[in-house]
Amino acid sequence: PFFFNDTATTEIYTLSLHDALPICNAGAGEDVDERAIRKNGVFAMTEFKPIKEGKVREIYDNGDSLIMVATDRISAFDVILKNKVTNKGKVLTQMSRFWFDYTKDVLPNHMLSVDTADMPEFFRTPAFEGRSMKCRKLTMLPIECIVRGYITGSGWASYQQNGTVCGIHLPEGLQESQQLPEPIYTPSTKAEIGDHDENISYEKSIEVLEKQFPGHGEDYATKLRDYTIALYKKCAAYALSRGIIIADTKFEFGLDENGNVVLGDEMLTPDSSRFWPLEGYEAGHGQPSFDKQFVRNWLKANPDSNYDLPQDVIDKTIAKIGRAHV
């Protein structure tokens, strides 16, 4: 089920994917204008040109701000797949919008607006509506801040081998998908497209940050860890009250013009998080998920796919990502 907070009425709605998008997008549920998009899913570069093209998002310079556009591309294992998932970019943007607003009392974030009326005219088309976010400019910190509340995925594989997750020793006897006694912080480096992120210790994160920001490494590392845990606890409690388990997630932070740590990038989307249904949850095995874990599992089972998904897998991915929508 969806749980969507309409800030105009503060009411909670339970929606299907097709019902949710028009409400979230304020009437921008039209089909994306394919004339504005190249075949590989990258938006046409005419008046505005992306200054950065990530695995899923494209970032445009807007003078004193940035426009971050979420495409319908999907990535897995640090590779961009050949397929697109219809409306995925809209879902990611609207989920981030909700969570940025929900957690603004914990720390500031980079979101300024998701209304294309607040953006240059170039972005006021169906191709960009619902999937674009106007953001503050930040100096991004070179750490991906991962927090795990449940043991699963690569963490479970590591625990089975040596009783640790990213170098953190955990109690004996844990089961797959079991909730951890306390959430654990497992940072990683940020890899370029095609490369793999590297898990690092908290101590190593201090070194990485100190190298780029002399005299501030430990201070920034501590803030990243503490903010990451605080954000996870607040959001996991809310999601649980709506029937969703947030097993783990990733945050990214940057610095504003005054050197303050600010939350950036995306927040608690199916691309950055594992969402499980609370109903039917039981530790001891893998869980059904409302995220792209379904795609990862299919790719593992089909190593010769050349990262090309069949239509039925794409359709199921659309349904699963839609059910996670906030």
What is each stretch, according to the model?
Residues 6-21:
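Short, small-residue-biased leader/transition segments that mark boundaries at the very start
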Residues 147, 246-267:
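Conserved metal-phosphate-binding beta-hairpin within the catalytic cores
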Residues 161-162, 170-219, 267-323:
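Anionic ligand-binding catalytic core segments
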